[in-house]
Regions:
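Structured C-terminal subdomain patch of bacterial secreted/periplasmic proteins
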Residues: 45, 140-141, 145-148, 157, ...
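Extracytoplasmic ligand-binding site segments that recognize negatively charged/polar headgroups
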Residues: 132-145, 184-200
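Short helices/loops that flank or line small-molecule/ion binding pockets
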Residues: 97-105, 123-124, 224-233
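Short helix-initiation/N-cap motifs at beta->coil->alpha
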Residues: 33, 87-98, 217-226
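Bacterial N-terminal signal peptides
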Residues: 9-18
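Bacterial Sec-exported substrate-binding components of ABC uptake systems
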Residues: 3, 19-54, 153-184, 233, ...
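A short, structured surface patch at a secondary-structure boundary
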Residues: 45-103, 107-113, 213
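Alpha-helical, coiled-coil/dimerization segments enriched in small aliphatic residues
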Residues: 73-75, 193-221
Length: 297
């Protein structure tokens, strides 16, 4: 492997070791990015308006700690057959304060779309934090914290170790044989909106050593113009959210690119790749395997 490739891989993998999390443990408290804090202890009546947090609690076997949840419009929260039956406090973007209070929670976990709800909870002195998974490392840190919140530290550690093994295995494969591809994960096709480098999908692409052609564009869901698409000539395009079929990606400009000509168009599971639960590691493996096929064509 030449020096440039080694340096690129070093930069690709080193970011994981940077200590900066969306939730931090400081002096016996859990502190979020917005400086909200709660005590690091076991809770018994948790209201969650964060899909990733709901999935993590089920994976820990701590569903008995869930008092109620915020529901989603589009994507499903796993395990669907159980989460569909949970009491609701409304939508995750704007859960009802009245409904939250009706469940007498000792902890509320929100997502970044419901920050205004946090302002109301603060006035009512209801303990809450805002969870924002931006990096793979955040998932590991959240596992540690949620294990403490639910009294399931051993279970959290087991899931942590499994996820770490999956990530380390991917690292080893990439170090041995880099993908050297470029592409994008699209949000919608008309106009063509993609995930930038600051998103969780962007983080995954960076981890895999893939150049995100929308990485440096402005906005959280930047527009990829036809000129940019043709100029960058991506090796692949992946669809998420409202894009349900590879055929939806076959726009005229796309067909002029390597991705379109070679039909390197596929769909990723939005409920995994956009959600910071340990299920993401499985989707990363699938994404990697899809890219290996493309690389070897």
């Amino acid at each position: 492997m030449n020096i440039k490739k080694r340096f690129f891989l070093l930069l690709t993998f080193c970011f994981i070791s940077i200590v900066s999390y969306s939730l931090e443990i400081k002096d016996g408290m859990v502190v979020d990015k917005y400086n909200n804090s709660v005590e690091l202890k076991e809770y018994n009546r948790i209201v969650l308006a964060d899909p990733a947090g709901i999935e993590i609690l089920y994976m820990l076997g701590a569903e008995d700690k869930i008092a109620a949840i915020g529901k989603t419009f589009m994507s499903k929260i796993q395990p669907v057959e159980k989460t569909n039956k949970l009491p609701s406090v409304g939508n995750i973007t704007k859960p009802s304060i009245e409904k939250i209070l009706s469940f007498s929670p000792d902890l509320v976990i929100l997502n970044t779309m419901s920050i205004s709800t946090g302002d109301s909870l603060k006035k009512l002195k209801i303990p809450f934090i805002i969870s924002e998974t931006e990096k793979i490392d955040d998932i590991f840190k959240n596992l540690e914290i949620y294990g403490e919140f639910t009294g399931k530290k051993a279970e959290a550690d087991a899931i942590y170790q499994d996820g770490k093994k999956r990530v380390d295995t991917l690292k080893a494969k990439l170090e041995k044989e880099p993908l050297n591809l470029k592409g994008a994960i699209l949000y919608v096709t008309t106009p063509m909106l993609a995930f930038n480098d600051e998103s969780l999908p962007g983080e995954i692409m960076r981890f895999l050593g893939v150049k995100n052609i929308a990485g440096d564009l402005k906005g959280s869901r930047p527009i990829i113009s036809q000129d940019l698409l043709i100029r960058e000539n991506p090796d692949f395009l992946a669809g998420a959210m409202s894009i349900k079929s590879p055929d939806d990606l076959k726009k005229s400009a796309v067909l002029k690119t390597t991705a379109g000509k070679n039909e390197n168009l596929f769909i990723v599971d939005s409920s995994k790749i956009l959600r910071g639960s340990p299920r993401l590691f499985e989707e990363m493996e699938k994404f990697y395997n899809e890219l290996v096929i493309i690389k070897n064509k």
